[in-house]
């Protein structure tokens, strides 16, 4: 699931995903965070 968070690298998305979906799993795609439920 894509969240409305910009990123330059996948590690930036982990805390954002944890905040958004409660799980620190995801990666940076095309400058946006994609989180895995």
Curated annotation (Swiss-Prot):
InterPro entries in the record: Scorpion_toxin-like_sf (IPR036574), Scorpion_toxinS_K_inh (IPR001947)
Site (Aromatic residue of the functional dyad): 36
Molecular function GO labels: ion channel inhibitor activity; potassium channel regulator activity; toxin activity
Predominant cellular place of this UniProt entry's protein: secreted
Note: Negative results: has no effects on Kv1.1/KCNA1, Kv1.4/KCNA4, Kv1.5/KCNA5, Kv11.1/KCNH2, KCa3.1/KCNN4, BK/KCNMA1, and Nav1.5/KCNA5 (when tested at 10 nM).
GO terms for cellular component: extracellular region
Keyword Thylakoid tagged: no
Residue(s) at site: Basic residue of the functional dyad: 27
Protein name as it appears in the record: Potassium channel toxin alpha-KTx 4.6
Known function: Blocks potassium channels Kv1.2/KCNA2 and Kv1.3/KCNA3 with high affinity (K(d)=1.9 nM and 10.7 nM, respectively). The voltage-dependent steady-state parameters of potassium channel gating are unaffected by the toxin in both channels, but due to the fast association and dissociation kinetics the toxin slows the rate of inactivation of Kv1.3/KCNA3 channels.
Disulfide bonds: 7-28, 13-33, 17-35
């Amino acid at each position: 699931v894509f969240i409305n968070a910009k990123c330059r690298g996948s590690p930036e998305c982990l805390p954002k995903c944890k905040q958004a979906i409660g799980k620190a799993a995801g990666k940076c795609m095309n400058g946006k965070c994609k989180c895995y439920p």
